[in-house]
Amino acid sequence: MEKLEQIVNEIEQLTVAELAELVKMLEDKFGVSASAPVMAMPVAGAAAGGGAAAEEKTEFDVVLKSFGAKKINVIKVVREITGLGLKEAKDLVEKAGTPDAVIKQGVNKDEAEEIKKKLEEAGAEVELK
């Protein structure tokens, strides 16, 4: 039990980018996926209408594509959104354009749009995946 608590304490110390990398490493190591399984639900209108209905995505990752000309403003907003320290937020912002530049993972559409709006107002270019 003490060993598990120690592992949890170590994980708490990681930054968002480090956590994302840890998840990728665990997925590769054990051949699993950390994403929640999606259950296929029959759509009543699709069978009757004969058309395929596109399933709307419910969880989004907010990815920083570019921090633009106002890097300091973007760092401030990233700190506000993530709760990271100054150095961690700066490191995350400087990873803009890479797969590690995930600001938030698995958020609902409204929250993702709100985060995107805040970052774009600060001068960043953001993508929702």
UniProtKB/Swiss-Prot annotation:
Superkingdom field: Bacteria
Keyword Transport part of the UniProt annotation: no
Molecular function GO terms recorded: mRNA binding; structural constituent of ribosome
Keyword presence, Ribonucleoprotein: yes
Alphabetical keyword list: Ribonucleoprotein, Ribosomal protein
GO cellular component: cytosolic large ribosomal subunit
One BP term from GO: translation
Matching InterPro entries: Ribosomal_bL12, Ribosomal_bL12_C, Ribosomal_bL12_C/ClpS-like, Ribosomal_bL12_oligo, Ribosomal_bL12_oligo_N_sf
Record-linked CDD domains: Ribosomal_L7_L12
Function: Forms part of the ribosomal stalk which helps the ribosome interact with GTP-bound translation factors. Is thus essential for accurate translation.
Family membership noted in the UniProt record: Belongs to the bacterial ribosomal protein bL12 family.
Binding partners and assembly: Homodimer. Part of the ribosomal stalk of the 50S ribosomal subunit. Forms a multimeric L10(L12)X complex, where L10 forms an elongated spine to which 2 to 4 L12 dimers bind in a sequential fashion. Binds GTP-bound translation factors.
NCBIfam families reported for this sequence: L12
PANTHER family: 39S RIBOSOMAL PROTEIN L12, LARGE RIBOSOMAL SUBUNIT PROTEIN BL12M
Protein name as it appears in the record: Large ribosomal subunit protein bL12
Source organism of this protein record: Thermosipho melanesiensis (strain DSM 12029 / CIP 104789 / BI429)
